[in-house]
Amino acid sequence: MFKYIGDIVKGTGTQLRSMVMVFGHGFRKRDTLQYPEEQVYLPPRYRGRIVLTRDPDGEERCVACNLCAVACPVGCISLQKAETEDGRWYPDFFRINFSRCIFCGLCEEACPTTAIQLTPDFEMAEFKRQDLVYEKEDLLISGPGKNPDYNFYRVAGMAIGGKPKGSAQNEAEPINVKSLLP
């Protein structure tokens, strides 16, 4: 008999607690957003759409080193290297299959030139999977992205045809090793 009364009291308490919780939520700020009208807050380091950036000079930053494709755990990046007359490398084609991409950011970390950057854009829905394969023309943006002053060829000091050694940023003049001998 006491067990029966205890079960009734316990059940009534559970229902009252649930009703108080529902009533309390009626006066709180809503968690649901009306999406297109109200934008979702994204943290600063949110990893969304991948873009290819340009140098401050307007040239492509990508040097087709293939490190992004090697670092990608799902293999959604493919590219092929080509070379200009002055010896500068660039990707002949650069392709990302966003239907396979998991937006892990490893390609951005592996890129030595900061050409690949992840933006906070996440609206990439398509009706056909073929439309989720982005080519270089779709990925290139007009600006330098997160690092506006960085230029790989000036910082790295790589030899470019017609440019003397030691003329790059942070690069010293070549040392004549034979002059150091006694």
UniProtKB/Swiss-Prot annotation:
Residue span(s) of domain 4Fe-4S ferredoxin-type: 52-82, 92-121
Necessary cofactors: [4Fe-4S] cluster
Protein residues bound to [4Fe-4S] cluster 1: 62, 65, 68, 111
Example GO molecular function: quinone binding
Keywords (A to Z) from UniProt: 4Fe-4S, Cell inner membrane, Cell membrane, Iron, Iron-sulfur, Membrane, Metal-binding, NAD, Quinone, Repeat, Translocase, Ubiquinone
Cofactor note: Binds 2 [4Fe-4S] clusters per subunit.
Main EC class the enzyme belongs to: translocase
Gene3D superfamilies noted in UniProt: 3.30.70.3270
Membrane topology recorded in Swiss-Prot or TrEMBL: Peripheral membrane protein
Pfam families reported for this sequence: Fer4_7 (PF12838)
One CC-aspect GO term: plasma membrane
UniProt EC number: 7.1.1.-
Residues the entry annotates as binding [4Fe-4S] cluster 2: 72, 101, 104, 107
Catalytic activity: a quinone + NADH + 5 H(+)(in) = a quinol + NAD(+) + 4 H(+)(out)
InterPro entries according to UniProt: 4Fe4S_Fe-S-bd, 4Fe4S_Fe_S_CS, NADH_quinone_OxRdtase_chainI
Domain of life: Bacteria
Cellular localization per UniProt: Cell inner membrane
Subunit structure: NDH-1 is composed of 13 different subunits. Subunits NuoA, H, J, K, L, M, N constitute the membrane sector of the complex.
PANTHER family in alphabetical order: NADH DEHYDROGENASE [UBIQUINONE] IRON-SULFUR PROTEIN 8, MITOCHONDRIAL, NADH DEHYDROGENASE UBIQUINONE IRON-SULFUR PROTEIN 8, MITOCHONDRIAL
Family: Belongs to the complex I 23 kDa subunit family.
Function summary: NDH-1 shuttles electrons from NADH, via FMN and iron-sulfur (Fe-S) centers, to quinones in the respiratory chain. The immediate electron acceptor for the enzyme in this species is believed to be ubiquinone. Couples the redox reaction to proton translocation (for every two electrons transferred, four hydrogen ions are translocated across the cytoplasmic membrane), and thus conserves the redox energy in a proton gradient.
Protein name, as recorded: NADH-quinone oxidoreductase subunit I
Organism: Pseudomonas syringae pv. syringae (strain B728a)
Gene that this polypeptide is encoded by: nuoI
